[in-house]
């Protein structure tokens, strides 16, 4: 009896060490692409989110390089991808998730990118507020120093 393998949609988020070189990043995803294609799968998208702050530190690391990818493959490809990522020292964390087959991948990515843009906007807003607080603190410190120098 012949078994047929059906490709299912997946997404993966990979967190790499913040000191990973561009070559190491490219090598990882070349290997992943080769693995997926060897199991007759296909990659739909690969996005680099860049270096971001972790929600909780991993060891002593507070930042990681984030990657997001969507692809179609069978379950054997997932097992092989996970095996190769566990071996790689530069991969801190990864998570494969099977996507709902009832939702088209295009529709999923549309909603995902909208959420990602909102998250980036919130992060920029937080950074701007932190910079404003830092500037206000520096100005207050300079004013106190000035008054102290005058002997007030």
Curated annotation (Swiss-Prot):
<dbReference type="InterPro" id="IPR035980">
    <property type="entry name" value="Ribosomal_bS6_sf"/>
</dbReference>
<dbReference type="InterPro" id="IPR014717">
    <property type="entry name" value="Transl_elong_EF1B/ribsomal_bS6"/>
</dbReference>
<dbReference type="GO" id="GO:0006412">
    <property type="term" value="P:translation"/>
</dbReference>
<protein>
    <recommendedName>
        <fullName>Small ribosomal subunit protein bS6</fullName>
    </recommendedName>
</protein>
<dbReference type="GO" id="GO:0005737">
    <property type="term" value="C:cytoplasm"/>
</dbReference>
<dbReference type="GO" id="GO:0070181">
    <property type="term" value="F:small ribosomal subunit rRNA binding"/>
</dbReference>
<keyword id="KW-0687">Ribonucleoprotein</keyword>
<dbReference type="Pfam" id="PF01250">
    <property type="entry name" value="Ribosomal_S6"/>
</dbReference>
<keyword id="KW-0689">Ribosomal protein</keyword>
<keyword id="KW-0694">RNA-binding</keyword>
<keyword id="KW-0699">rRNA-binding</keyword>
<dbReference type="GO" id="GO:0003735">
    <property type="term" value="F:structural constituent of ribosome"/>
</dbReference>
<dbReference type="GO" id="GO:0005840">
    <property type="term" value="C:ribosome"/>
</dbReference>
<dbReference type="InterPro" id="IPR000529">
    <property type="entry name" value="Ribosomal_bS6"/>
</dbReference>
<comment type="function">
    <text>Binds together with bS18 to 16S ribosomal RNA.</text>
</comment>
<dbReference type="GO" id="GO:1990904">
    <property type="term" value="C:ribonucleoprotein complex"/>
</dbReference>
<dbReference type="InterPro" id="IPR020814">
    <property type="entry name" value="Ribosomal_S6_plastid/chlpt"/>
</dbReference>
<comment type="similarity">
    <text>Belongs to the bacterial ribosomal protein bS6 family.</text>
</comment>
